Regions:
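N-acyltransferase acceptor-side catalytic subdomain
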Residues: 1-193
Length: 193
C-alpha cells in the first residue's frame, strides 16, 4: 500500500484483523488462584463489572461454599487473545432434579453475577462461550444464569440453533431497585429448574 506524501491526505495503514480467541478450561481451585492477576486486570477492563466478579470475592466464596454448591470441580471457561485473558465465565455444574445444571459461581450470595468479557469482544466472546457449551453438551442438560443485570452480555446473545431459551424477570435488588434477570438455556427436552 502506498502512502501519500500529501500532508492533507490522512496516512493509511493496513487494518489488522482481530485475532482468533482461544478457549481454555480451568477445573480446579489452584488453577483459579493462578489466574488472579490476569483476572483482576480483566475486571478493570469491564466497566459494568461488580465486586462479586472479582477474584477477591469469588475465590473465598468457592473455598467456603464450593463443595456444597457442586460436587464437581469448577468449570471456568477462559478466552484469550494473543495470550491475554479477555473473557472469563466462572461456572460450575450441579446435580439438580435429576439433571446437570450449569450455573455461575457465587449464586445465592451475590446480587449481580455475570461473565467478564472485554467490552470490545463481548458479543463475539459470549457467542464463543455458547459454542463451547454446545461442544460440551454431553456434560450438562440446562444452563441457568441467575441474578443478571439488564446489561449482561449473557442476556442478549442468540443461542445456538436447536437450543431452548427462556428469560425471566426476577425480584428487584433491594438496595438499587433494579431488576435481576434469569436466563435458562437447554438442549434436548426442557427440564424443570
Amino acid at each position: 500500500m502506498a502512502l501519500s506524501t500529501d500532508t492533507t491526505t490522512p496516512c493509511l495503514r493496513p487494518a489488522r484483523a482481530p485475532t482468533p480467541l482461544e478457549v481454555e478450561e480451568v477445573v480446579s481451585l489452584r488453577g483459579l488462584e493462578q489466574l488472579q492477576g490476569e483476572w483482576r486486570w480483566l475486571w478493570t477492563r469491564c466497566p459494568t463489572a461488580t465486586t462479586f466478579q472479582r477474584p477477591e470475592w469469588l475465590l473465598p466464596w468457592f473455598r467456603s461454599f464450593g463443595a456444597s454448591f457442586s460436587s464437581q470441580p469448577p468449570w471456568v471457561i477462559t478466552l484469550r487473545s494473543e495470550g491475554r485473558l479477555v473473557g472469563l465465565a466462572p461456572l460450575a455444574i450441579r446435580e439438580e432434579n435429576g439433571g446437570r445444571v450449569v450455573r455461575l459461581l457465587g449464586e445465592g450470595s451475590a446480587e449481580h453475577l455475570d461473565v467478564l468479557m472485554d467490552p470490545l469482544l463481548a458479543p463475539h466472546g459470549v457467542r464463543l462461550l455458547f459454542d463451547w457449551l454446545a461442544l460440551n453438551g454431553e456434560r450438562w442438560d440446562t444452563c441457568v444464569f441467575e441474578q443478571l443485570r439488564e446489561s449482561s452480555p449473557l442476556l442478549h446473545k442468540p443461542t445456538p440453533e436447536g437450543w431452548g431459551d427462556r428469560t425471566e424477570t426476577r425480584e428487584p435488588c433491594p438496595r438499587t431497585g433494579l431488576h435481576h434477570y434469569r436466563r435458562i438455556l437447554w438442549h434436548g427436552p426442557e427440564r424443570k429448574v
